[in-house]
């Protein structure tokens, strides 16, 4: 959410920065928070440092107490318009009303926060980017943490992906549904690879199928990756059987056949991106003054461009998806590939997933030989078990 879009014209807009801290030191739970209210130019107008003596308090509770205190002070100072600068995704969602608190203590604190906001003309929740969060630490958190009563050492975490054990706690990423944690850099690289593969963006943890969301991970990615993710989300909303691709090789934009049908009559369609007309039935550029049957009769063989594409595909060992006819090139990795239409097939032979034995360690897999080898191995294990049993019996009765 952009502040400039919601800032009333001619009205001064203030910023509220808040941060809660909880740590366990010498078998004692220490907690405290800092608050800073800044002007338009991020000049510090007010700061507050408070320690909390409660062995049962949680970090989320401390963060909300800090926010509540900051809003109270803003009202006391006569401020009417203020931005609530959040660096905690869940708190941002709570204040925006996107998420609902599960714990009663959090619900009570959130109720107080929303009640105080009613005394302000406008209070805009803003989710800080990583760079903005660093700036917030520079002129707000650092300005108050040096005077805060508790002394909290930098907490280090270990990433389960890269195994780096010297990562600051605020650089760790937690997957909402599974709770798995890894460093932000590993999450970023994982999402980038998944986007380039066209695969589902799941938790980076091994064999975890929990889905990641762009809202949760957007601040970790570049604008280009965010745009790719946004487009991928839109594409996934189109049913597989309703997908149609622009035949223009320089475009290949994915579209919904149902939506295109509502804009045109007959089989002539126009690409929503490049504008080139095409036949939705033949999946080729528009054949003027020819019906589909007439076009197929006059063009029984592939066009010159189709022939070039076929020769290039043979030369590069490309595979064509049997479902949507899209060409796919595998540069590296597993030979079981997933087309952008969702169809999975073997890159080596082109068969549908599960219909061949490629990728099992041998390309010339012989089932008879395989079964024979397995039987020999089992027989070998049985012989070893018998020998071990005989030795144990001899030792027992000798």
Curated annotation (Swiss-Prot):
Q: Which GO cellular component terms are attached?
A: plant-type vacuole membrane; plasma membrane
Record gene name:
RSL1
Q: Which GO terms describe its molecular function?
A: nucleic acid binding; RNA-DNA hybrid ribonuclease activity; ubiquitin protein ligase activity; zinc ion binding
Residues the entry annotates as binding Zn(2+) 3: 279, 282, 287, 292
Please state what the annotation says regarding this protein's domains.
The RING-type zinc finger domains mediate binding to an E2 ubiquitin-conjugating enzyme.
Q: What is this protein called?
A: E3 ubiquitin-protein ligase RSL1
> Where do the annotations place Zn(2+) 4 binding?
321, 324, 339, 341
Disruption effect?
Enhanced sensitivity to abscisic acid (ABA). Decreased seed longevity.
Q: Which cofactor does it need?
A: Zn(2+)
Q: Where is this region: TRIAD supradomain?
A: 155-374
Enumerate the subcellular locations listed in this protein's record, separating them with semicolons.
Cell membrane; Vacuole membrane
Q: How is this protein organized at the quaternary level?
A: Interacts with the PYL4 and PYR1 ABA receptors at the plasma membrane.
Zinc finger region(s), RING-type: 159-207, 159-208, 321-349, 321-356
Say what the protein does.
Acts as an E3 ubiquitin-protein ligase, or as part of E3 complex, which accepts ubiquitin from specific E2 ubiquitin-conjugating enzymes and then transfers it to substrates. Negative regulator of the abscisic acid (ABA) signaling pathway which targets PYL4 and PYR1 ABA receptors in plasma membrane to promote their FREE1/FYVE1-dependent trafficking and degradation upon ubiquitynation; this process involves clathrin-mediated endocytosis and trafficking through the ESCRT pathway. Involved in the maintenance of seed longevity. May enhance gibberellins responses.
Query: Which Pfam families does the record associate with it?
Result: IBR, RVT_3
Q: Which reactions does this protein catalyse?
A: [E2 ubiquitin-conjugating enzyme]-S-ubiquitinyl-L-cysteine + [acceptor protein]-L-lysine = [E2 ubiquitin-conjugating enzyme]-L-cysteine + [acceptor protein]-N(6)-ubiquitinyl-L-lysine
């Amino acid at each position: 959410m952009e502040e400039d879009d919601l800032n009333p014209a001619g009205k001064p807009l203030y910023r509220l920065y808040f941060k809660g801290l909880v740590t366990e030191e010498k078998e004692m739970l220490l907690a405290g928070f800092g608050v800073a209210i800044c002007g338009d130019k991020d000049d510090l107008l007010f700061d507050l440092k408070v320690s909390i003596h409660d062995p049962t308090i949680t970090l989320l509770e401390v963060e909300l107490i800090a926010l509540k205190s900051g809003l109270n002070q803003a009202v006391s100072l006569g401020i009417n318009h203020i931005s609530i600068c959040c660096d905690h995704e869940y708190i941002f969602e709570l204040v925006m009303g996107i998420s609902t608190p599960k714990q009663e203590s959090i619900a009570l604190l959130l109720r107080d926060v929303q009640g105080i906001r009613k005394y302000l003309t406008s209070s805009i929740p803003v989710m800080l980017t990583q760079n903005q969060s660093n700036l917030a630490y520079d002129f707000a958190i650092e300005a108050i943490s040096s005077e805060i009563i508790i002394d909290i050492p930098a907490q280090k975490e270990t990433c389960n992906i890269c195994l780096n054990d010297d990562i600051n706690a605020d650089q760790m990423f937690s997957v909402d549904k599974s709770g798995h944690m890894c460093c932000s850099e590993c999450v970023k690289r994982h999402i980038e690879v998944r986007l380039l593969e066209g695969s589902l963006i799941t938790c980076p943890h091994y064999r975890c199928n929990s889905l990641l969301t762009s809202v949760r991970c957007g601040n970790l990615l570049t604008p280009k990756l965010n745009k790719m993710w946004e487009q991928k989300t839109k594409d996934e909303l189109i049913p597989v059987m309703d997908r149609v691709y622009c035949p223009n090789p320089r475009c290949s934009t994915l579209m919904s056949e149902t939506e295109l049908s509502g804009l045109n009559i007959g089989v002539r369609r126009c690409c929503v991106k490049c504008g080139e007309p095409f036949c939705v039935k033949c999946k080729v550029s528009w054949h003027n003054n020819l019906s589909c049957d007439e076009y197929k009769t006059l063009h029984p063989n592939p066009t010159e461009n189709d022939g070039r594409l076929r020769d290039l595909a043979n030369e590069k060992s490309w595979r064509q998806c049997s479902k949507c006819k899209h060409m796919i090139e595998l540069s590296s990795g597993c030979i079981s590939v997933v087309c952008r239409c969702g169809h999975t097939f073997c890159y080596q032979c082109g068969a549908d997933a599960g219909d061949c034995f490629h990728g099992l360690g041998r390309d010339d897999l012989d089932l008879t030989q395989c079964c024979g080898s397995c039987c020999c191995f089992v027989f070998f294990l049985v012989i070893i078990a018998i020998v071990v049993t005989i030795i144990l019996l001899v030792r027992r009765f000798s």
